[in-house]
Amino acid sequence: MIITIAHTKGGVGKSTLAWHLAHSFENKQVKIIDLDFQQTLYFVNIISGDTLNVLQPLSVDELINELEAVAPDDICIVDVGGFDSDINRAAIEHSDRIVIPISESITEVLGFRTFEGILKELKVDAEIHVVLNNIHPLTKNFDIIKEAVSKNKMKLLNTVVRSRKIFRTAMGEGSHIFKVADHLQAKQEILGVRDELRCNQ
């Protein structure tokens, strides 16, 4: 299964979500394709001791070859950069699941609408899911996001991933949320995203 974490806006937490989500799968072969020009996941994986297979295809053809090699029972998570490009569009078009991280701010909604336009241009057969990500712990009202998503053929996940220091700290140390003690709620949030995507069966 190919899961693409996508948004044309940078700073929405795509790489952080992709990294922790990749470590949530049990008894699965998991690889990451890092298309972000910042190469965040590539370098975090080096710090971790190369615990995952992180690839950086340099062309559309190379990317497609990697995606076509993904077995049905394996997991491939694609972290696209915060910009529009041919290689990012190819990743989206070859996905089984597209996950769009978004926060509650009005600027995020505007960025979401821009990305929505790109999706309409592409031939996308994948399920498209929106996840409230990097959300302030006290925020409860998501009406703006719900309204934006309701106008599209997308599903807003019930799981809300809150802004948590441990997500960033663990990642910065080359670790992940499932390797640290405690922080049960943070772990449940990542598992909630995984389970709602129905890709650990």
Predicted regions and their residues:
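Inter-lobe coupling/hinge region of RecA-like P-loop helicase motors
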Residues: R168-K187, L191-R194
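Inter-motif core of Ras-like GTPase G domains
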Residues: D86-S105
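Short, conserved loop/helix-junction motifs that constitute active-site signature segments
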Residues: H94, K120-D125, V149-S150
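P-loop/Walker-type NTP enzyme "switch/lid" segment
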Residues: I2-V12, W19, H23-D86, M171-S175, ...
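Conserved C-terminal guanine-recognition region of P-loop GTPase G domains, centered on the G4
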Residues: L110-D125, N133
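Beta-strand-loop-alpha "switch" segments that mediate conformational coupling across diverse proteins
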Residues: H136, E147-H176
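Structural beta-sheet core signal
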Residues: I32, V78, I100, V130-L132
